[in-house]
């Protein structure tokens, strides 16, 4: 498994999500592929570590398998790397968006599917704790039937959306939102009152996983330098 190919796939899937946003069917399709690549990257880091530490794991490499073989061989440096990775991975996911991605990945791994995707209105310029308004339209096979119907429903929901978001914006001395500064996008919800925009989440998360790859390789190099 080639990590660099997987990170390139993440970038491609992120662009495809942006292209098809907010269509639930296509966003779900490419977001699923994005998450599969993320899981492959994490396993790929331990595949590289398996080679560099000389553990000779022949089956599919995961962190658990890596730990089992390192314990069996009493390879303290390999165990140090795994412990470092766990701490580093946890730290990288402390911020809200990476934390949400981690929860979505866990949900998908446990349920073999993503949480339900919904279409919501948001302001084009994002501010912390902004209000999002769900819009419901007819779908065919989970696909948007017509952009015209979507636009009609956005227009219908706009007055109440602007009233609520601008009350919040005014309270926080933030720029006012007008009807020309709203857009629809696909969101997922894992927890009450915590809707996460998928396109934006992927844009934020790709640099996080890139950093995790680079720093993991540096740590492996540091721990195997004497070998």
Each model region followed by its residue ranges:
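Extended, well-ordered alpha-helical segments in internal regulatory regions
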Residues: 40-52
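Glycine-rich, low-complexity intrinsically disordered segments
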Residues: 29, 33-36, 43
